[in-house]
Every structure is written in structure tokens, then in C-alpha cells.
Amino acid sequence: MNKDKIIIKGARVNNLKNINVEIPRDQLVIMTGLSGSGKTSLAFDTIYAEGQRRYVESLSAYARQFLGGIEKPDVDSIDGLSPAIAIDQKTTSNNPRSTVGTVTEIFDYLRLLYARVGHAYCPTHHVLIESQTIKQMVDTIDQYEDGTKLQVLARMCRNQKGTHKDLFEQLVKDGFLRVKVDGEMRLLDEDIVLDKNKKHNIDVVVDRIIKKEGYRSRLADSLETGLKLTGGEVIVENLNEKTEKLFSQHLACPYCGFSVPKLEPRLFSFNNPLGACPDCKGIGVKNEVDNDLLIPDWSLSINQGGIRYFKTSVGTDRIEWQRFLVLCREYHIDLDKPLKDFSKKELDIILYGSDKPITYTLQSSSGNVSKTTKPIEGVKTLIQRRYEETTSSWSKEWYASFMAEHTCPTCQGKRLNEQVLSVQVGGLNISEFTDMSIEKALDFVQNLKLNETETNIARLIIKEIKDRLTFLNDVGLGYLTLSRRAGGLSGGEAQRIRLATQIGSRLTGVLYVLDEPSIGLHQRDNEKLIKTLCNMRDLGNSVIVVEHDEDTMRASDYIIDIGPGAGVHGGEVVAAGTPEEMMKNPNSITGKYLSGEYKIPVPKKRRKGSGLFVEVKGAKENNLKNINVKFPLGKFVCVTGVSGSGKSTLVNEILCKAMRAKLYHSKEKPGKHREILGLENVDKVIEVSQDPIGRTPRSNPVTYTGVFDDIRELFAKTPEAKMRGYDKGRFSFNVKGGRCEACQGDGVKRISMHFLPDVYVPCEECGGKRYNEETLQVTYKDKTIYDVLEMTIEDSLSFFDNLPRIRSKLQTIYDVGLGYIKLGQSATTLSGGEAQRVKLASELQKKATGKTVYILDEPTTGLHSHDVARLIEVLNRIVDQGDTVIVIEHNLDVIKVADHIIDLGLEGGDNGGTIVVSGTPEKVAACQKSHTGRFLKMVLE
């Protein structure tokens, strides 16, 4: 094995052209090149895939079937490979229970810290909760009315699996008669059979007492017995009121009896029933009917269909509508009054219903008349009940269309119950700690004052928390909170969290492969990331990074430039060497951008725009501080700011969703804002994301852009097709007729190999051509429909030269820099940047209205500087047609060519959410307090 280099011979994965590469070990190596050149194919699909495969191969066949096998990459040999870890941009988890704290394991250490050195305080009296004596317990019960029936219960087990047969036998021997199993009273002399795989709660009935004269001594004896059984906890159930009160020799308020169970780590978990909020079950939010989704237009009256649920019911004999009319009549609700003019009382009646029984008569569609007396539920409670009761997936979806996530009213989004939230360390409960930004949490932990005993107990726990918070802060994530949902993180944030976790593991001798870790990171924080990557290398690891960021490249030890072009024009090693060597290499486009020989020019003048605006007023979603923001129309607008400053919240959550709601009646609820002005100046809003254009092999660039319809029509007009009676549907691989039915038009068949990976083989029937033999006998210019789909966009331009309708559509795909991709290339093989440019090409084909707003979130993700230049050309074409482009971006090459910049900040998280400066790039560069301006000034000079 080579100790100094990773030697790759004959790599042919995807578009790699049988290349040989030598990569120095234990160094920071950057792989760069144009989008689609083959960087990812080499770094992830070859090097990482082979490292992972070798590890999996070392396991038994039994273990491999659970892990899933990994296909051997198409490469002759790789020598000098270490165990490989990939840190990519996939979001960590969409599970609503996953947070930054749980993903990084910091929350596990916090639970341990609060269980070991936490102190509970009564939420009402704010006094330290300490253990209760039996006398204090009896005094609390003494407050009940005389004649109250009481039941003393001892907690024997909580949320524990098993049949618990031994426990029941022991309780019988001890002379007990009754137990409460999972809330149900059972006699111990009967045969109690429990499911051993389910968790159970078991309380033994110690005594049943009626509160009367002389009962105190008996109650005290029973409490003592119960406390001995459980080691210090007992429940007294008030059978009259059906309420329970927990008493503890450990922790309880001396004034109101507020008790807290014994502090243990699982109590502080919102994934455990013991600690979770009983209302939202630890999620922090509830799916509830939303007033604005139920009543989209408040200017309408009920009779005008203002309540969307009844829109189809007005004027019909539907029972629900009849019942609702009875409710309105009973409370004198005016059905012709605009809903915006309703008083709170009137609104509460139509939403939540009556609080008293109403006598009314209903007639069914069959003519049956029924009379009843009962309260009538409001439309909101009706939908909520129907949603919970229905078993039909269609109905559930319909009811869900009126619902949105709302903060849980019981725990206020804190996820935990009252007992857990009463426990504090350093004056904060665990929820308050996780709601702080990582930067503030780190400062809090570093300055935490504990007594000598607590310090000895918590020393190691605090060290782990401090280290992990430091790593997260060091990769530029100091603005995040530990309570932030993992599913709401961007790809770049999720990747940097995994990066911080890996640094915490302090592994050595490992090969790390990273995919653009600088995504979503402001230049100000780039230095922190570079330092982190260098630290990983200095631990004795090989770090391979697929990256386009020039600062990262300059800080690297070695650069490998893959190219020279993309797709069929790429797949070769153009240049390799140190950053200094790359700058001198005449073959490397990357080197020319690094040296400054190539650069994206600054426009000589900025556009004036149409003079019209869309203005967001009172934006206060997430960390936005009630700001008013003007977006000029007919300009190239760039929204900038450090990570976490509120850019995505402003543009994606408020502006975009509000425009979609107004223009398309979208059911998505925009983020909190007062109003949006100027929407009459916009007739279309288009989000151009990097999401795939399709998720099946049948989706491809020509089906997405609509060119394939024209191509199929062309084939249907050929003499051979006319003679056979084929229409254009014959040339579709999505429907029966012309496609190969053996593979259903996919061209490949999947073969399940059980404990080996699934194998995809070309279809034996059509040989991977997707169509049946008869269809492939039809040709145009001696080419079959399959041959045309196999052409590159570049080649197809000359092939369709005399057909302007087809050629013009293909030209737009070529113009966005995708001349190298095939017409029928599967959508699943396109990168995010390529998918985004296919979408832009599709939009460029449409006639400009001058009233369209395009929204792009970090479009330079995955793009080389040369690709960025092309992207800017495309975006400028859109704006030159009179439309508006709004881009969220950190890339200075994009920011410097914008007509108007809206810079948010100053910092991220709580310290963000305000407008630092707004105006031309020159104005922003002149603003001394703007972090963006400071870096922009360098590239404008």
C-alpha cells in the first residue's frame, strides 16, 4: 500500500475518460472544474464509493443485507485508500423530532447535566423544590372536602416492557389486592396477561380511604407503605374529581405541593412520554385549522362563500350547512356581512360553536326529518374532529388543506412538560438553554458558576458540551439554536453540522470527502471553515473537497482541475498541482480565474428598472425585526447578508409565498408580515430551484422543456409514420403503443440481488433503446427517435437547423451552458446546477411579460466561476426583457453585477433580521457597517 499517495488507475465512472490520478495523502486536496465535468464522479462515485465498498465487503453476508451493498465503481485499481467518510449536502433528517441539539448529541449531554446538577423551582411560588415529609403530604390532602374518596397508589413501574409476572406475584405475597395497569383497575387474584413487547405503567393500590375525622393517621401509614415500596414516590387519587396528585420525598413545593419526579436523563427528553408535553407529545407544534386557510378572503360574507369549507355547500341541503345556519340564526349572525367586520364574539361562535344546547330540526336529502337538542360545533371544531376521525386518505388530505402548524398552546413550543421545565441550571431551564444561539450558549457554559460538589459531578459533561458548541461555532454556525429543527436546515448547514461532529470525533488516518462545504456561507465566515478543514488535515487525515470557492482553493495544499469542459467534453485531468502551479498552468480555466487573468466584469452602468416596487411591510417571521423592504421591479436584485440573517425567511417564506397566495391562490401560509404592496405590478412568480426536474429515468431535458412534443410530432409527420398510421403518441415512452413494454420505456430493468446491491441491466427486448422494433423503423434524416435522444444538445442544433421552432428551444438549453448533455439524459443524472439551468432554459422559451418575478436561492451552488459567468448572462437576458430577478446569494461575482442589493444583518440569529443597507453595489460597498460591503469593496476596486 502506498503511504504518500492515493493512486487511481483507469477511472471510467460516468463521463470519466479512463483517467489516472495521483492524490497526495494527509493533505487538503480540492477537486474543481466546470459543472458536469466529472468532479463528483471522481470524488464521491469513485474514491468514496470504493472506500465504502471495501469496508462493507469486510462484513458478513448477513450484515451486508441490512447495510445494502455498494456496486464496485468502474475503475481498474485504487491504491493507498483509507477508510472513507462522506460529508455531503443531504439534509440531516425530516423527522420533526430531530433538532440541531439531538443531531449533534449536545442535547444528550444537556439531559445528563440537568439530571445531575439541576434544581427544580416551583413555577407558581418560585421557591426551590425540596423533598416533602409525610406530614406535609397529609397536610396537602387535608385541603380536600370531607367525604372525599381517596386512593393511595404506589408507582411500581413506568414505561417498561415485559409481562411483569414476577412483580404481580410479589405484590400478592405482600398482601395487596388491586393494581392499576395502563390506567385500568385490575384484581391481583385474576390472571393478568401483558404484551411483553409493549411499555406498561403499573401502580399498586396501597389503600382506599374516605376523608373524615381521624383519617390522618391511617393516611400517614398508607403513604409510608407506598413510599417504601417505590423508594420515595406515591400518588393520591381523588376519586370524586378523578384527579391525581404526585407526592415525593424527593422534590415538591411546600406551598402548593407542585411535585417533580426523581431527576434522571430520560425525564428531560421530549421523545420520552415522561418528559414530553402531554398535548403535542414532544413535537412543540400541533396541526390545527388555520383561520386564514379557512377564510382566504375576509372581505367576503358567509353567503358569498367566504368560509372555504362551505363554499360548495351554500344554497344546498347538506346537513352540515343546515346545522351551521341554525347556529347562525340562534346567535343572530348576519350571513351577508363581510367576515372582516365580525366581532370577536361572532367569530368565536362560527369557528368554535355554541356553549349551550340548541333545539333544531334537520331534513335529509331523502326527506327524513329529525329533531334534536344539543350544542352545535363551529366550522373549526368540525374540521378538526373530522380530520381526527376519518380513515379515508382522500378526506384526511381535504381536511388537512385547512390546517397549518401552530405552536402548541400547552408548552408554547418548548416540547417538554411543566415538571421538566421547572428544573434549572444557572438560572435557565433546558428549553431556554436550547433556544439560545450556539454562540450565546457557548458563552453561558464557559461562565457557568457551580458549587464545588456540582463542579466535580459536571466537569466532564460540561467539557463535552463546550467542545461540541465550539466546533459548531468554528464552522460558522454560531447563529443557529440547538432547538432548530434539523429538517429546516439548508444543505450547507447540515453538511457543516456533520463536519463539526466529525471534528469532535477526532479520528485520524481517515479519508474525508466533502461536497462544497462553503455553500450558504458568507465570506466573513469562510476563514473559520478553512481553518476547520486544515485542522482535520492536521489530525492526520486526507481531506478531499469538491469546491469552487477561490479562498478555499488558495488555502489548499493541492488542486485537481477536471475538464476541460462538461459532460462529454469533460472527464479528464486538465491540471494538477499546488495553487501557485495552477495559476501558471495555461490549460487550467480555474488557474486563470485564480490568477485574475479571467474575471467576470462589473457592469458599466446599473439598470434604472421600471420605477415600480413590491414592498413587504412589517416582516417579522423568525428573526426579522418588523422590517419594511422594497423590491424594485425590472432590475436584477440581490439579497445578501451573513448566514442566519433572515434572507431565506424574507424572500422564500414571506415574499414568494405571499405572491403565490395572491396570484395562484396557493394554500401555503406566508410568514408573518403586515401587508404587501405593489402586487398588481406582478402577474407571475417563478421559483427556479436546484431540485431535480424529475425523479424517474423517463424525465429528461426535452420532456421538461417541451421540445419532445415537437420532435414526436415531427416523427409522426414522416411518410413511414403516416403510412403506418402512427400519431405522435406512438413516439412517447410514457404510454403504451410505441414503447418497449418489457421495460415500460425505461431502457433498463432492475434485478433484485437480495443481500447484494440491485443491478440495473439494459433491457434484453429493446437493448436499452426504450422503444419497440416497429417504432424504431421510422426515421427522420436516417435517425430513429432513439438516435435523436442520444444526441447532445450541441449536435442536435445542426440536425434541426431547418426547423426553427425546435432549434430555438434547443438553442436556449445550449445558451445556458448545457450543450454537452444529451436530449434524453435521465433527470436523475443531472446535478442541481444543471437542473436549475434546464428550468431557466424552459423559462427563456416563454414570451416575456415584463411583470414576471424570478426567485433563485443561491443559484451558484455547484457552479465553477466559468459557469457563474454563463448564469449571469442568462439572468441578465431575463432582466433585459423587462422581468425581475431576485437572487439570494453570497457569491461576490453575482452580487457585484446586481442592479440593487438588499443587505440583511448585522449578524445571524437574534442579532440579525434588520436591513443594514439597501441600494446599488457601490452604495453597499461604501457602507462601513456592512459585512457584505467590506468584501464587495475589494472586487469593485
Residue ranges and their predicted role:
Residues 1-941:
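Conserved phosphate-binding elements of NTP-dependent enzyme cores
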